[in-house]
């Protein structure tokens, strides 16, 4: 089976073609980073309009790169939610229109299921069951995964997501958008031990996260200290260490609770080098293994949507002709495959 996948949930327009026998055939992506940089964050209306401009050329490019015609496509998958509703509707309209005109089945995919399954695009894939740490600008959650669609959310952020905390703290430090990667780059120049940031909610039972207080602590520290480059780097490192330690502590707790030996990390923050190293070291000590997608599949992309959609289309799941974008959509409400 061969599926065209479309991703437009936020500020990346992604289109890909995935074949269940040959793997990923093409992967095209347009990022709106430059468009939103002057505003310090994503402007929903501008994001939607830019998706409209880019989506048709990217669909054509993805098909050409895969050496496909419409006759070679067996189904269409598109991100139905969660995300910015205007942006979602661009991809949903395109996906539904293509499926209808080609007389192919279509399926709306949960954006976070796409991230969760992104490591399946690699050669070394995790076996079920596994624990998934999904960390992005909009979500931070721990999920027990028994199979595709068999999800139990064990914990999630009660306020800011980890990626949001990275971006907001970076903005407080005067770093350009997108701030998370720039803060990590600055932290690489830092010296450990100069500052100690709290590890939120690690002294309490449970697996939920909270990062808003950490952001406030960072703001107060930034305001109280000098603005020289080394001090800024030290603060950035202390912040990054606090986020990574918090995520690692919660992962260890969840692994003990579930008894799982495999850990998946996915979402934009999963590209963070310090987080990957910390979790890899932890899993080695526990006799387990950590899995994550390559860097280009940590952020939003059409490949993960094509893969996730293919699994559901193969199981006979399809959507009706209605065009829907779901801004909020609990992951654990999805049907199993």
Swiss-Prot record:
Gene Ontology cellular component list: cytoplasm
Subcellular location: Cytoplasm
UniProt keyword Metal-binding, yes or no: yes
Residues binding Fe cation: 111, 115, 300
Named cofactor requirement(s): Fe(2+)
Catalyzed reactions: L-threonylcarbamoyladenylate + adenosine(37) in tRNA = N(6)-L-threonylcarbamoyladenosine(37) in tRNA + AMP + H(+)
A Pfam family that the UniProt record links to this protein: TsaD
Predominant subcellular localization, coarse grouping: cytoplasm
Signal peptide: none
Residues involved in substrate binding: 134-138, 167, 180, 272
Keywords recorded for this protein, A-Z: Acyltransferase, Cytoplasm, Iron, Metal-binding, Transferase, tRNA processing
Gene Ontology terms, MF aspect: iron ion binding; N(6)-L-threonylcarbamoyladenine synthase activity
Family: Belongs to the KAE1 / TsaD family.
Name this protein carries in UniProt: tRNA N6-adenosine threonylcarbamoyltransferase
Native source organism of the sequence: Shewanella woodyi (strain ATCC 51908 / MS32)
